Amino acid sequence: MKKNIIIAMMAILALLLCACGAKQEGFGQDDLGLEVNGETYYLRTDSAPLIAALGDGYEYSEMVSCVYDGQDKTFAYPGLTVNTVPVDGKDIIEMFTLTDSTYATLRGCKVGDSREAVIAAYGEEYFDDGYINYTLTNDPADIQAERIQFEMNGDTVSAIYIYSPSY
């Protein structure tokens, strides 16, 4: 009887541990952001709070927007470039480009990580067109789908693009 109780308790404990180790969900809207100083900034939101958090140490450029009325802007920081588009009087985040290991994706991937680390973090549902692509639709033909692209140099991440195409 005592042995059966111990076995039953071990089975319950095993079930509880399995329930706590919830599987990472597939790629989704919540992955389309960047954490800076404990705050998360997402694509398609006002860039002003992010630029304020990053500070003044950037190289700035702008050009007439092909899609919107106003100026597309680029704020290039060491290891991170933020591209914006003008929407309703605000500079909206269109893309983050991570170029060194200073910044990570919201799942912790950085420049310098291995291909295996990326797949472990984001899963097998990607397509490879020269980049490892995780998109909201997982459709290579859907060029308008928001995405994360991992540029590879061999099996090592050399740049990461988190973006929302405007076209």
Residue ranges of predicted features:
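N-terminal export/targeting and maturation segments
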Residues: 25-59
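Second-shell loop/turn segments in exported
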Residues: 34-41, 102-109, 147
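Positively charged n-region of N-terminal signal peptides that target proteins for export
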Residues: 1-4
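Bacterial signal peptide processing site
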Residues: 21-23
